[in-house]
Swiss-Prot record:
<protein>
    <recommendedName>
        <fullName>SsrA-binding protein</fullName>
    </recommendedName>
</protein>
<keyword id="KW-0963">Cytoplasm</keyword>
<dbReference type="Pfam" id="PF01668">
    <property type="entry name" value="SmpB"/>
</dbReference>
<keyword id="KW-0694">RNA-binding</keyword>
<dbReference type="InterPro" id="IPR020081">
    <property type="entry name" value="SsrA-bd_prot_CS"/>
</dbReference>
<dbReference type="InterPro" id="IPR000037">
    <property type="entry name" value="SsrA-bd_prot"/>
</dbReference>
<dbReference type="GO" id="GO:0003723">
    <property type="term" value="F:RNA binding"/>
</dbReference>
<comment type="similarity">
    <text>Belongs to the SmpB family.</text>
</comment>
<comment type="function">
    <text>Required for rescue of stalled ribosomes mediated by trans-translation. Binds to transfer-messenger RNA (tmRNA), required for stable association of tmRNA with ribosomes. tmRNA and SmpB together mimic tRNA shape, replacing the anticodon stem-loop with SmpB. tmRNA is encoded by the ssrA gene; the 2 termini fold to resemble tRNA(Ala) and it encodes a 'tag peptide', a short internal open reading frame. During trans-translation Ala-aminoacylated tmRNA acts like a tRNA, entering the A-site of stalled ribosomes, displacing the stalled mRNA.</text>
</comment>
<dbReference type="GO" id="GO:0005829">
    <property type="term" value="C:cytosol"/>
</dbReference>
<dbReference type="InterPro" id="IPR023620">
    <property type="entry name" value="SmpB"/>
</dbReference>
<dbReference type="GO" id="GO:0070929">
    <property type="term" value="P:trans-translation"/>
</dbReference>
Length: 149
């Protein structure tokens, strides 16, 4: 598995509850651009329309050697999931008010592009502060243990 890009902001802004692996519908120049230069997850999210899941605001830069038929960098891209998974996602988003965010995009062992999406709940500002405090405390404890071996 070759990871192309990860959404680091997702882990700090959301509590991730569940993850799914989804295929993604891409054009040829998009796959070439992913192999060449990667992707940008800034402000990307998933939306469900007509029983299909779409990935919005994922920026895949244009392919350098492309011609006039090059792709639009921020077009909505359809995610390929089983119907059961889509229905489960719809239920969680509507009933519990959760959001679907992409966390990782990668090539699997067969060379196919996959997106890891997560069902997540947004963190409040005080939750983020608590996480930072916990990280600092753990860092200090580990530093203390290293010194006093």
């Amino acid at each position: 598995m070759k990871v192309i890009a990860t959404n680091k902001k997702a882990y700090s802004d959301y509590n991730i509850l569940e993850t799914y692996e989804a295929g993604i519908e891409l054009r040829g120049t998009e796959v070439k651009a992913l192999r060449e230069s990667g992707a940008n997850f800034k402000d990307s999210f998933c939306r469900i329309k007509n029983g299909e899941v779409f990935l919005l605001n994922l920026n895949i830069p244009q392919y350098r050697n492309g011609n006039l038929n090059n792709h639009d960098p921020e077009r909505p891209r359809r995610l390929l999931l089983h119907k059961k998974e889509i229905h489960r996602l719809i239920g969680k988003v509507k009933e519990q008010g959760l959001t679907i965010i992409p966390t990782k995009i990668y090539f699997n062992s067969r060379g196919l592009v996959k997106v890891e999406i997560a069902v997540a709940k947004g963190k409040k500002k005080y939750d983020k502060r608590e996480d930072i405090k916990k990280r600092e405390i753990n860092r200090k404890i580990n530093e203390y243990l290293k010194r006093n071996r």
